[in-house]
């Protein structure tokens, strides 16, 4: 490493060589590093230094010196300060040891830098840490692939797939019928938030994603292909260092929704059905893709973005409506695109894949709905009927985005019914691999994401509800109410509007933070009823208590017992088959 003051570190007049880089990384971690992980860390450290030196040799020198101090500060205790090591009020170690001295040197160096220069150095480290994380992720993926390669096709269980392992245990313990029942009830519900510590620009995400793809290819390349790979990687790393990690202004809740959409487009939409498919591939074996699937659509993503208003005045009823509309439009457009892609490739001639009577009835229904849409593909009907139907279904989905009342799908269930008609027709005609291949993948995507993409979870503080009810009791629903009270009522009206327009699943969860009694649950149901003039307009809600303090957790059983006695909760339990969160 470099030492600006002429210490014992490496000189500045040359780049860090591969062997020096490897030694530095090994010293830094002080743990045994797998060779492939070390190679990637070496590669990225060399590239980071090359980019920094091209940008400004002085910045590269500062990076070297701080990196060197970081390594020495972690000697003997990688990654943290020892629990019994004395520190000052700022957490800086005060002991007279090599590691403590290195730590203090790094702090003093950073404190002495001008703000602009400190920002550049911090950005350099931030970009390198992104690259280090990519190295670890790449190694984890390679490890999982190696585990899969070691699984014998003769094995009863795929030991690399936790879902398959659990399924195998259930078969042994409770038998096939009970296992099928439990599998049908499986649900995985991750929730996306807009926590500041998780904020990352889409521009940065895109660069990291492209570097990850290049790193994945790197070990398999040679010659000019390898040179081009590394040139492209350097280009992306250079751009990463020069790109601000944060937006110029704080994103609005509507802009934060783009984070979910980006994750959806680049990961969830394609990856989730692949998870289902991998389970089916092992459980069904050679029959996979030619018989009805076993794996249910168990993934149910949720989101607090655009709906969590506890302490966030920027999330209003109007914002929630706009975020819901954004999710809906993107989701249905994505389904339309996928439906059209499948339709274009469903070129199965009718003389080899005869359409079922139900498929022809569906076509007749589509003709009655719109001769314009069906007229565009009418010539295909006698030749490739399944293709013709799927293309019209795609056009209906496009009409759904445009809110064309004449042709739009009113619900994802209506779309699923049409897809299953196509699937059943293909299967009966002997084209099982088309039925349970691409068409089944689209069915899984509709079952998983519906038209809503994510289930919005509304959250508000229990005290806000108490104050709103007190205000209403004093002035009446139509009286002069406090702005926050009006916003609370508008929130329930927004939930009702979202449910009517986009389906109940998009906005049925309502979380009460700092729940201290069953009364706080009752407050939500009461406010929901007060927000509407007609009882039939009141939305269905799954009100969920959030216990955030130790005292509340200790009292949670009493609160839940009281909650179960509420008439609104009993009514909701009757609708959900006695299930609640």
Name each region found by the language model.
Residues 2-475, 484, 541:
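Often metal-dependent polyanion-binding catalytic scaffolds in large enzymes
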Residues 291-292, 307, 315, 424, ...:
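Conserved alpha/beta-domain cores
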